[in-house]
Amino acid sequence: MRTNLTFCFVYLILFNFTFYTFLNLQILYQDEHLVAINKPNGLAVHKSKLVGNTNEFALQLLRDQIRKRVYPAHRLDRKTSGVMLFTLAEKVSSMLQKQFMERNVSKNYLAIVRGYTETHEVIDYPLTNYSGKVQEAITEYSRVASSELDLPYGKHETSRYSLISLTPKTGRTHQIRKHMNHIRHPIIGDRPHGCNKQNKLFKNRWEVNTMMLHASEIEFSHPITNKKMLLKADLPNEFKRTLKILSLNFTSA
């Protein structure tokens, strides 16, 4: 247990369940209308049938922490860490959600993926949602760093990895995860969209069992003041540790 963090992670193996216990959430920004947190990996934003058995949610924890009712302004996967916006009034939440719908919000992610990616690429590949509807989906990414380890993998004598910066142009469910798997550069630790062999390698060799996808930045207009806002979330320690393991050089701005 790491007590020096803003949240506490307890990992127990009991009947094949993983239990998380979170303490105070890291607040990145707060005023009378908005509050932004650096959401830990493994914490669902709110209760839904997709998150399975869990008793803790960011919505509930933040409400109890600041003693005010909060409303999520957008989605962020349970397995993804990083910037998550909430509002303190339902009306303000609707105003922010309108910015998302009109694509006036820019979100940036960092991910560690298998292989050497292109230097820059736009992935334009439609995705099918849960109801079977095919939707436009576009993700732009750039390679930040790459490395090669003297570690045999499959038919290859070495293992290659890339750190990439991604900007989704649309907001489909699991869009980044599905797009990276589609171009054969799956995100390390991603289940079910990743590479099972790589995930097993990282778990057994380095005890890395979390998904290497982090929402690092979000840029939007304040729904009340119209001021341009840029919020950044520092990388989780596990992400930093994995960068070090793979010799991927990265310095956040």
For each of these PLM feature ranges, what is it?
Residues R2-A253:
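RNA pseudouridine synthases
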